[in-house]
From Swiss-Prot:
GO terms classed as biological process: glutamyl-tRNA aminoacylation
Similarity comment: Belongs to the class-I aminoacyl-tRNA synthetase family. Glutamate--tRNA ligase type 1 subfamily.
Self-association state and partner proteins as the record states: Monomer.
Any one GO cellular component localisation term in the record: cytosol
Motif 'KMSKS' region per record, residues: 240-244
Gene source species: Rhodopseudomonas palustris (strain BisB18)
HAMAP family: Glu_tRNA_synth_type1 (MF_00022)
Keyword Transport (UniProt): no
Protein name: Glutamate--tRNA ligase
Single GO MF descriptor: zinc ion binding
Amino acid sequence: MTLPVVTRFAPSPTGFLHIGGARTALFNWLYAKKRGGKMLLRIEDTDRERSTQAAIDAILDGLKWLELGWDGDVVYQYANAARHREVVDEMLAAGTAYRCYASAEELAQMRESAKAEGRTRFYNGLWRDRDPSDAPAGVKPTVRLKAPLTGETVIEDQVQGRVVWQNDNLDDLVLLRGDGSPTYMLAVVVDDHDMGVTHVIRGDDHLINAARQKQIYDALGWEIPSMSHIPLIHGPDGSKLSKRHGALGVDAYRAMGYLPAALRNYLVRLGWSHGDQEIFSTEEMIEAFDLPAIGRSAARFDFAKLENLNGHYIRHADDQSLVTMLEDVLRYIPHGDEIAAKINDTTRAQLLQAMPGLKERAKTLLELIHSADFILADRPLPIEPKAQAVLTPDTRKLIAQLRAALETVTSWSAATTEAAMRAFAEQHGLKLGAVAQPLRVALTGRTTSPGIFDVLAVLGRQECLSRLADQASE
């Protein structure tokens, strides 16, 4: 009988949920959903000095924002330390592990000798078959795996293919430190086994770990999960991903105004492909995703592509949802609280009314907020330098005339104000653009905005007449 698929996302809480980790979580989540299985979440907090509660909170928050839910309770690796030690005791009893009393000086000498001789395996087996009665008094030993000295360790990787290591290049790795704390290599194997993990999907920087962990599985007589080591994400120039390239936490992308659906869509295409399709709904991702379609080459992060994709999602988003997302993002941006204080039932309704025009140009929620500034701005309206250049004495006189014409409009709407302005332009022998631009500058403080008649309708009669009066001169 085929076991149900169980994947896991297992971050270390030593910092934020970075973009590479987010993609790993997404791939695990998609594969579990595709196969009708579960994705578990394990926090690998065995490094007590570097693990922080703030980092744990950031990881959980990032996954929730990306809408990558996990199944069951969060597993904390450190809490399983007693179980890890229990397994080591079993291995000692079975003779697949041994106590090592080598001193720091002896280990340093072994490393130097291995380096001089060009060997990757540095530990010389000093305590591998030595009589325990030779143990020096008062020394707390480590416990090492009695790894095979000959032959090969092989991983049939779903992404990388068949990967082979010569056993004479692999050390007797430490399972338990001198203070009794389990090492990462041991803890991962025991936890994956106990959690029933069937598929391990992680970055290919863990590939060498797979060889070492396979030897632990073999020593315990446990079946190794299916392994898939996905390529890392590089910068646009092929170099290691840096903050300049996008190596930021998921929280930073939220604060930059990206939508979770857009970021998921972008991340799924970093290293995985499905023909020429670029836009995927969540349902389409789940339907199409599979491990063999992940490439072996490092994916390149491209901010411009992400921005364009985010713009697509903004343009196709429901207007009410965008207003909600716009309000939500304010808590994560500088001066967001000041903007939030200006949003009330009236301005919220204006934002909703203006959204069809606002979202056409915006690539991020921050651009959307910037475009909506004219709705929330206090009088007198701040005028951008480029717009200020439009406000010549003649233009200010024209604005006074336009205001007088608009004052006659009683039933205020985009259609009625447009009719009034077209009539004014025709009467004065002007093109509509010569009328629209002074209006735009006076009403928004900018030279670009949504359609000017939509702006008139959104702001309402009294606010428009007041703003025009602020910029008019006789």
